[in-house]
């Protein structure tokens, strides 16, 4: 008989991957880099009214004589958009004196780090074996595994 090939993922869906500390850190760094490279822009649909709802119109009746000319600030914001890295280079902070974004840092903490649950925020004595997140109860572990474990949360 010929053995049927199966996918590695479909063998045991209940089995969780266990990552070591270095793999967890690489994963977090990769996710943070993806967030940094993400092209943030204002919501293009923010000014549009929602369908099916009538929104009240607020007009200034006192200033009916003169109409104010609308500024083209949004046009320049969109046309000359810069990312965070470009703004830092433009400020030339590496040669500036005094504390700035590149040179400011806090001293080491005087007390050890307190572990808090990633789900509810209470003190947590347990750690997830897959991703290293903290949890306090079995209920929080279940919520973590269903919604957060090895997903895009930092």
From Swiss-Prot:
Q: Name one GO biological process term.
A: heart process
Q: Where does Zn(2+) 2 bind?
A: 128, 131, 144, 149
| Region (Interaction with NR1D2), start-end ranges | 72-110
Provide the alphabetized UniProt keywords. Answer: Chromatin regulator, Coiled coil, Metal-binding, Nucleus, Phosphoprotein, Zinc, Zinc-finger
Q: Consequence of mutating residue 103 to A?
A: Impairs the p38 MAPK-mediated phosphorylation of ZNHIT1
Binding residues for Zn(2+) 1, per the UniProt record?
Answer: 117, 120, 136, 140
Q: Which domain of life is it from?
A: Eukaryota
Q: Which portions of the chain have biased composition (kind: Basic and acidic residues)?
A: 14-23
Keyword Zinc tagged: yes
Motif, Nuclear localization signal: chain positions = 38-47
UniProt-listed InterPro entries: Vps71/ZNHIT1, Znf_HIT
Result of mutating residue 134 to W?
In a colorectal cancer sample; somatic mutation
Tissue expression remark: Expressed abundantly in liver, but weakly in skeletal muscle, ovary and small intestine.
Record's subcellular location? Nucleus
GO cellular component terms given for this protein: nucleoplasm; nucleosome; nucleus; Swr1 complex
Signals that turn on the gene? Induced by DNA damage.
- Give the HIT-type zinc finger regions: 117-149
Q: Which residues form a coiled coil?
A: 23-39
Give a short account of what the protein does: Plays a role in chromatin remodeling by promoting the incorporation of histone variant H2AZ1/H2A.Z into the genome to regulate gene expression. Promotes SRCAP complex-mediated deposition of histone variant H2AZ1 to lymphoid fate regulator genes, enhancing lymphoid lineage commitment. Recruited to the promoter of the transcriptional activator MYOG at the early stages of muscle differentiation where it mediates binding of histone H2AZ1 to chromatin and induces muscle-specific gene expression.
Provide the family line: Belongs to the ZNHIT1 family.
Under the subunit heading, UniProt states: Component of the chromatin-remodeling SRCAP complex composed of at least SRCAP, DMAP1, RUVBL1, RUVBL2, ACTL6A, YEATS4, ACTR6 and ZNHIT1. Interacts with MAPK11 and MAPK14. Interacts with NR1D1 and NR2D2. Interacts (via HIT-type zinc finger) with the RUVBL1/RUVBL2 complex in the presence of ADP. Interacts with histone deacetylase HDAC1. Interacts with histone H2AZ1; the interaction results in recruitment of H2AZ1 to the MYOG promoter region.
Official protein name in the record: Zinc finger HIT domain-containing protein 1
| Species of origin | Homo sapiens (Human)
Q: Which lineage ranks, top first, belong to the organism behind this chain?
A: Eukaryota, Metazoa, Chordata, Craniata, Vertebrata
Q: Which gene encodes it?
A: ZNHIT1
